[in-house]
Amino acid sequence: MTLKNRYKESIRPKLLKDLGLKNIHQVPKVVKVNVNRGLGEAASNSKALEASLNEMATITGQKALVTRAKKAIAGFKIREGMPIGCTVTLRGDRMYSFLERFINLALPRIRDFRGVNPKSFDGRGNYTVGVKEQLIFPEISFDKIDSIRGMDITIVTSARSDQEGKALLQELGMPFSKN
């Protein structure tokens, strides 16, 4: 059973009851997943940007968008319009497919993994987790990467509070640490 079907058939009715909501449309759902990677060396090294775009496309199954500097910062040696990273926004079936792979395959492959930080909510039910290396994804092979780079994964939900967001992610299978 896919994560999307599990959400519709078992998670949504359970959350409706647990959160004491009156309408099925009030139940929090995952709206989108943002996968973002900042590349400091992209301004001077175009191969790093190209490799990063390919990795992001392999991991997410969707072409990555190049993010560019909004204004020049002399201290970082960047000018306006220079590429400084890449991002992918996932919605719909691709989002659920990515979340399922991230929660069930990628997170357990992190070294010394004891669960994700339950305090990484933003106050509006959205959750962000930082990944230190792309090797946790089974699609990436160690031989094909040139350097280890991390990424930020933001799960945007329709939850109105952090408690609702946490309840949703726990039901989806997100392994929160017990601290």
UniProtKB/Swiss-Prot annotation:
Gene Ontology MF terms:
rRNA binding; structural constituent of ribosome; tRNA binding
Q: This protein's superkingdom?
A: Bacteria
Extract the Pfam families matched here.
Ribosomal_L5, Ribosomal_L5_C
* Keyword tRNA-binding attributed: yes
Identify the PROSITE patterns for this entry: RIBOSOMAL_L5 (PS00358)
Q: Where are the transmembrane segments?
A: none
Q: Which UniProt keywords apply?
A: Ribonucleoprotein, Ribosomal protein, RNA-binding, rRNA-binding, tRNA-binding
One GO term under biological process is: translation
Instruction: Give a Gene Ontology cellular component term annotated to this protein.
Output: ribonucleoprotein complex
Q: What does this protein do?
A: This is one of the proteins that bind and probably mediate the attachment of the 5S RNA into the large ribosomal subunit, where it forms part of the central protuberance. In the 70S ribosome it contacts protein S13 of the 30S subunit (bridge B1b), connecting the 2 subunits; this bridge is implicated in subunit movement. Contacts the P site tRNA; the 5S rRNA and some of its associated proteins might help stabilize positioning of ribosome-bound tRNAs.
The entry sums up its family as follows: Belongs to the universal ribosomal protein uL5 family.
Oligomer status and interactors:
Part of the 50S ribosomal subunit; part of the 5S rRNA/L5/L18/L25 subcomplex. Contacts the 5S rRNA and the P site tRNA. Forms a bridge to the 30S subunit in the 70S ribosome.
This protein is called: Large ribosomal subunit protein uL5
What species is given as this protein's source? Prochlorococcus marinus (strain MIT 9301)
- Specify the taxonomic lineage: Bacteria, Bacillati, Cyanobacteriota, Cyanophyceae, Synechococcales
Q: Which gene encodes it?
A: rplE
